[in-house]
């Protein structure tokens, strides 16, 4: 455990925690002593993750099946968390999706689904868990946006994703401005391409390896743990004066 990132006794809620970046961040929080609440739609995988995290780190882990686009389910999750732990200190809005296609081919349904999950779902969770934080006078909200919420992308058509993640970037600023006086900080992480169990095969392909060398100043994609440390920083006492920021963790992709 790192004394600077110590989260002992705190309760961290992570959405989209069944796989990928959500699970990586949950592990990072657990390694620093935080009790966890894992939210996702894949109930069996959540239960398996909860058991593994409890065994490895000795923290309490609560697994809740939840669709973040349904307000009643999120409200139920908040009630369950408060009943068990009595507090919510950290919320990581990680759940999301990705519609890929040229703008002229995207349907209304595809566009609205993207916005519904990535933007509206993030707002629902921030609002509902934020109420508990407002009551407590303390909270750390970390929204997972994307580097494509900051810049456009000529490589692959994904206008709905860009629009939704750009919305998350500005939602972060708005909530930070509104809730800062109540002891709540709201920041976002804007990841580039990061290795996870879901992305490894794609990122290791010749096409993506060549793209990394051409487009990313560091010449590679993010490794496991390189996003987690940013999340830990934003959740920890080390970031008490950091609010309303959108931090790109992208190897420099957005600076060129």
Report the location of each language-model feature.
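Conserved glycine-rich cofactor-binding loop
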Residues: 11, 18-20
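Active-site helix of classical SDR
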Residues: 126, 164, 172
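Short C-terminal tail/terminal secondary-structure segment
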Residues: 2-4, 231-232, 243-256
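Short, small/polar-rich loop/turn modules that mediate ligand/substrate recognition or access, typified
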Residues: 92, 180, 185, 242-244
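Alpha-helical segment proximal to the catalytic Tyr-Lys
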Residues: 131, 177-181, 240
């Amino acid at each position: 455990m790192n004394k600077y990132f110590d989260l002992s006794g705190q309760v961290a809620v992570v959405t989209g925690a069944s796989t990928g970046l959500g699970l990586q961040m949950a592990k990072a929080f657990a390694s620093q002593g935080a009790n966890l609440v894992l939210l996702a739609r894949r109930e069996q995988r959540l239960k398996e993750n909860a058991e593994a995290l409890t065994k490895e780190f000795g923290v309490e882990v609560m697994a809740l099946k939840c669709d973040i686009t349904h307000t009643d389910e999120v409200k139920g999750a908040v009630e369950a968390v408060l009943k068990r732990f009595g507090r919510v200190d950290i919320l990581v809005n990680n759940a999301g999706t990705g519609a890929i296609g040229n703008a002229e081919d995207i349907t209304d349904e595809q566009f609205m689904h993207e916005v519904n999950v990535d933007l509206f779902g993030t707002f629902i969770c921030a609002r509902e868990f934020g109420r508990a934080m407002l009551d407590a006078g303390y909270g750390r909200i970390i929204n997972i946006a994307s580097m494509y919420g900051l810049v456009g992308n000529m490589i692959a058509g994904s206008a709905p994703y860009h629009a939704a993640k750009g919305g998350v970037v500005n939602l972060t600023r708005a909530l930070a401005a509104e809730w800062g006086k109540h002891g709540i900080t709201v920041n976002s992480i804007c990841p580039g391409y990061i290795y996870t169990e879901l992305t490894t095969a794609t990122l290791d392909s010749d096409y993506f390896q060549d793209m990394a060398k051409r487009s990313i100043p560091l010449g590679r994609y993010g490794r496991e743990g390189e996003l987690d440390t940013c999340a830990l920083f934003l959740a920890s006492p080390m970031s008490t004066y950091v609010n309303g920021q959108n931090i790109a963790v992208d190897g420099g992709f957005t600076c060129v």
